Amino acid sequence: MSLLQMDNAVLAFCYDGTMKLGTLAVSTPGLTEGVVGTSSVLLGGKYLIAARALAERSAAIFKKMSLVSLNTTLSEGEALRVYSALLDKAKSP
């Protein structure tokens, strides 16, 4: 996974092997704590739920607009678990 943090957004590229663009999802953080913001899949047709969930998680963790690309050979559930854990680690000091 590669993570690019900007002043107003976070880009996360979730992949195994070489970096490739995958299913692309965007999310905004919720306005209050514990509220999920708006999210949508922009491109792709594989792992729609995982890509969207990762974008929502990234937006909640970093409190910024989030764009997530997911390209993996893992199962959807396993990819969601693995990349969610990596996002949590990335935010830890």
Give residue spans per PLM region.
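Short, well-ordered secondary-structure micro-motifs
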Residues: 24, 78-79
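Conserved mixed alpha/beta catalytic, RNA-binding, or beta-rich assembly cores of soluble enzyme
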Residues: 1-56, 60-61, 65-71, 89-93
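A generic structural motif
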Residues: 72-76
